[in-house]
Amino acid sequence: MQIDGREITSELEIIRALQAESIGKTEFVVLDNGDDFIQTAVGCLEYRANGKNYKAIPEPIEKEKIQTAFLSYFRGDGQYLQDFTWEEIVYESIWTKLKKLFKK
């Protein structure tokens, strides 16, 4: 797994990256595992698995809960999936949005 292209080998590295985001040294943190990831920015928590994206609701998510989710993802124990209510993020192209707008 990686953060900013750096291989992550310990939970401490994840904690430090999240602390940097919480004090404004970075805008977001993405822990990626190939095509899948977990990410956070400004109290938002999202993950991607099997080509689908999800966000934790309701927002904002507390910093401690975000850290717990990142560590769970790193360990591969799946606990983060049970700790939140997840909503699928569905992306629409600009053309689809425009068509809907002009049908009204």
Where are these regions (language model features)?
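Acidic, proline/glycine-rich low-complexity IDRs
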Residues: 1-104
